[in-house]
Swiss-Prot record, chain A:
This is Nitrogen regulatory protein P-II. It comes from the Bacteria. It comes from Synechocystis sp. (strain ATCC 27184 / PCC 6803 / Kazusa). P-II indirectly controls the transcription of the GS gene (glnA). P-II prevents NR-II-catalyzed conversion of NR-I to NR-I-phosphate, the transcriptional activator of glnA. When P-II is phosphorylated, these events are reversed. In nitrogen-limiting conditions, when the ratio of Gln to 2-ketoglutarate decreases, P-II is phosphorylated which allows the deadenylation of glutamine synthetase (GS), thus activating the enzyme. Belongs to the P(II) protein family. GO terms for cellular component: cytosol. The gene is glnB.
Curated annotation (Swiss-Prot), chain B:
GO terms for biological process: nitrate assimilation. Its main location: membrane. Residues 279-670 are annotated as: NrtA-like. This is Nitrate import ATP-binding protein NrtC. Its EC number is 7.3.2.4. PANTHER family: BICARBONATE TRANSPORT ATP-BINDING PROTEIN CMPC (PTHR42781:SF8), SPERMIDINE/PUTRESCINE IMPORT ATP-BINDING PROTEIN POTA (PTHR42781). It comes from Synechocystis sp. (strain ATCC 27184 / PCC 6803 / Kazusa). One of its GO terms (cellular component) is plasma membrane. ATP binds at residues 42-49. Residues 5-239 form the ABC transporter domain.
Length: 112, 670
């Protein structure tokens, strides 16, 4: 199992959600986050070349899927979240050792 | 390290008055370090100045962005100064006032005397002290251009953008100014990006020359490094041993692009016909019964052809790849699923045939092959490539034979690459025999061959029949290599542009369908039908859906990348990958390496048609082209130096470089 974490533009949430649901994803966690990337998070400039680092509002989506679905999920995410402009976000993929559903105690794939 | 300036996947699209769009620049990717001197060359209208304008901030990219020191460029700024061809001086101000205008605005925080000093210094830098109080009308062209340069430098920019700065000057003035510019750049350490038409000028001034292809959808065709040491002098650079070779390469590039432009005029027509329905709805498409014919089967069975208006698509099962090539040549087939190198091979007329220009607008699958050896090698303990080499060396009088499907197939090229990287010469130490894929296993059983490299299900078939074992899959050689592509005659694509677009769209959707593992069981059942692969799902399933059994001690494991149809931008018809195929075909002496490889690759591999289909489907069409490729042995292929790459191999045949003019021959035919 893998965890796919995507940092996306807030206004892209609906598109991403629809794309993932259509791809057969049954659950996701969304949180509001702030951060910066290569852009140092801002485009303002004060007098010449003085810059500050600012945090920008983004959304983080977390999904846990079977290994076989990762590529497909990533492709759907990219298609849906992309505008082509700088600041579209990033996707991080990491392994998940185990999943437990609290209500039933089911484990791993059944618990997703 | 972060580059000083990064042009990050930039597209520039202009809307047309008739509602259409003109894609001027497509997917430009370039990293520039501080203090570097870059020249942009290319034919008029290819988008050089547009690119420069986007760096200056006067224009904005439609997609992607330009990043300087970690910040996106969104507007013009004093740290990026532009020198235009037409000087752009204010005629009512003197030289000094023109420069002062810039300095007083940008450096207004400095005390007055310092500003004055900067102005004087810059006038002195371009040697115009005596003319400081003249107006532009009283100056010669060269002097005016020097004022423009002084003005640009006076604000202490980090980047100097030069748009054909010496275009309007006479040769002598130009020469002097070039030398002055080099000195100034050397002193100030400013990064320069210059647009020029003059190849000698580009060579004299630049560290790297970036050559753009002819638009529409202009992109970086080739990047040349200029290794001439600095300081350079106009009269001395010509003596540098690489000067004429580099100059020749640039002129050659421009000539290739000129030819490409004439051909491009035809394909423009393609876009204009887009919305008017299809020209042809009955297609005969050739395929070979293999697991990776799945996209064609899905497109037919799941109605993707129908959805895009292709109502009568006939999938023609062919006995061999040669039959597919013949079918295309004889026009019996409208198009076919081909091994990745076949469109290039047909275009070049490989094997002494007449060149037949082909088009590949999409890759239909990646990976999916394996090298299977006869069980007798397993009994002799051959587990690795090195074992195989030792085993073959033991019996020099006995030559083993391996089967491959077509000279232009990835199976052949990867098998040869793999053997050669283990110091086995595929032409001398071993015998390669050409056989159609469905006949591999029976030949292995009959003892005609000792192994083969082929697509599934034939490796799994040999494993399940206990005839052989898989010593390597292509995941071990080049994970993600292009495998099957769509191949159409160029003449056909030009005649039926809307049909071609519909076909690509249908197949793209089919590819996406194939890569969803929830659909794999269903596809498996289709593939097993007699009109398609026609074997039991037991043989097709390994790798495609279930664990892949190599038939050795190793436990069968899930290879999720084994059949890629859509994910990881599988369908993008990358030019760099096409060029890699050309290098390997030349390496083994199948073809003369085309001197005009840029032209050949641009004609055959068509990301523009792919992009068009993606845009119609609402998919992102972006993928970096012009990237390096490296295989399992770690040797890096850079698309700027294909010949150097071939020569770095220890084992290769004699390389001939010839110009292959596909059009002239084409005209004779008609």
């Amino acid at each position: 199992m893998k965890k796919v974490e995507a940092i996306i533009r807030p206004f892209k949430l609906d598109e991403v959600k629809i794309a993932l649901v259509n791809a057969g994803i049954v659950g996701m966690t969304v949180s509001e986050v702030r951060g910066f990337g290569r852009q140092k998070g801002q485009t303002e400039r004060y007098r010449g070349s003085e810059y500050t680092v600012e945090f920008l509002q983004k959304l983080k989506i977390e999904i846990v899927v079977d290994e076989g679905q990762v590529d497909m999920v990533v492709d759907k995410l990219v298609s849906a979240a992309r505008t082509g402009e700088i600041g579209d976000g990033k996707i991080f993929i990491s392994p998940v050792d185990s999943v437990v559903r609290i209500r039933t105690g089911e484990k791993d794939t059944e618990a997703i | 390290m972060m580059p000083f300036i990064e042009i990050d996947h930039v597209d520039r699209i202009f809307p047309l008055p008739d509602g259409g769009r003109y894609i001027a620049l497509k997917n430009i990717e370039l990293k520039i370090s501080q203090g570097e001197f870059i020249s942009l060359i290319g034919h008029s209208g290819c988008g050089k100045s547009t690119l420069l304008n986007m760096i200056s901030g006067l224009d904005k990219p439609t997609f992607g962005g330009v990043i300087m020191e970690g910040k996106e460029i969104t507007e013009p700024g004093p740290e990026r100064m532009v020198v235009f061809q037409n000087y752009s001086l204010l005629p009512w101000l003197t030289v000094r006032q023109n420069i002062a205008l810039a300095v007083n605005r940008v450096l207004r925080d400095l005390p007055k005397p310092e500003q004055e000093k900067i102005i004087d210094d810059n006038i002195a830098l371009v040697g115009l002290q005596r003319a400081a109080h003249k107006r532009p009308g009283e100056l010669s062209g060269g002097m005016k251009q020097r004022v423009a340069i002084a003005r640009a430098l006076s604000t202490r920019p980090k980047v100097l953008l030069l748009d054909e700065p010496f275009g309007a000057l006479d040769a002598l003035t130009r020469g002097n100014l070039q030398e002055r510019l080099m000195e100034i750049v050397q002193e100030s350490g400013v990064t320069c990006i210059m647009v020029t038409h003059d190849v000698d000028e580009a060579l004299l001034l630049s560290d790297r020359v970036v050559m753009l292809t002819t638009g529409p959808e202009a992109h970086i065709g080739q990047i040349l490094e200029v290794p001439i040491p600095r300081p350079r002098h106009r009269l001395e650079v010509v003596n540098h041993p690489s000067y004429y070779a580099l100059r020749g390469e640039m002129v050659y590039f421009l000539n290739q692009q000129k030819r490409a432009k004439k051909v491009g005029a035809v394909s423009q027509f393609a876009e204009a016909m887009g919305g008017n329905g299809l020209e042809k709805i009955n297609l005969d498409l050739g395929f070979i019964p293999l697991t990776d014919c799945a996209p064609l089967v899905v497109a037919k069975e799941k109605g993707f052809f129908q959805k895009h208006g292709l109502e009568q698509v006939n999938l023609v099962k062919e006995p061999s790849w040669q039959a597919i090539a013949d079918g295309i040549r004889e026009r019996r087939l409208d198009g076919a699923q081909m091994v990745a190198g076949m469109p290039l091979a047909l275009t070049l007329g490989m094997g002494g045939k007449t060149p037949l220009p082909m088009v590949t607008a999409m890759v239909m699958s990646r990976n999916g092959n394996a090298i299977t050896l006869s069980k007798k090698f397993a009994e002799a303990g051959v587990k690795t490539l090195e074992d195989l080499r030792l085993k073959l060396a033991e019996t020099p009088d006995q030559v083993s034979t391996l089967g491959m499907v077509h000279p232009a197939s990835m199976q052949n090229l990867l098998l040869r690459y793999w053997l050669a990287s283990g110091s086995i010469d595929p032409d001398q130490d071993i015998n390669l025999m050409r056989l159609p894929p469905p006949q591999m296993v029976s030949n292995l059983e009959a003892g005609n061959i000792d192994g083969f490299c082929v697509g599934e299900p034939w490796n799994s078939y040999a494993v399940k029949q206990n005839l052989g074992y898989v010593i390597a899959t292509d995941l071990d050689i080049w994970n993600g290599h292009p495998e099957k592509v769509l191949g159409m005659r160029e003449e056909w694509v030009n005649k039926y542009p809307a049909t071609h677009l519909a076909l690509v769209k249908a197949l793209l959707e089919a590819c996406e369908y194939c890569d969803d593992r929830r659909h794999r069981q269903e596809i498996l059942d289709y593939l097993a039908l007699p009109q398609y692969v026609g074997t039991s799902t037991e043989y097709i399933s390994p790798g495609f859906l279930t664990e892949y059994d190599q038939g050795n001690d190793a436990e069968a494991e899930m290879l999720l990348d084994f059949n890629q149809f859509y994910v990881k931008q599988s369908n993008y018809p990358s030019r760099s990958e096409g060029l890699w195929i050309l290098t390997q075909l030349a390496r083994w002496g199948y073809i003369d390496f085309p001197k005009n490889w840029v032209e050949i690759i641009e004609r055959v591999r068509r990301p523009d048609l792919f992009g068009e289909a993606c845009r119609h489907l609402g998919w992102p069409d972006l993928e970096g082209d012009h990237h390096n490729v490296s295989l399992f042995d770690g040797m890096v292929f850079t698309p700027n130096d294909p010949l150097g790459y071939i020569k770095r191999f220890t084992i290769h045949r004699d390389i001939q470089v010839t110009e292959i003019l596909i059009d002239q021959i084409d005209q004779v035919n008609q």
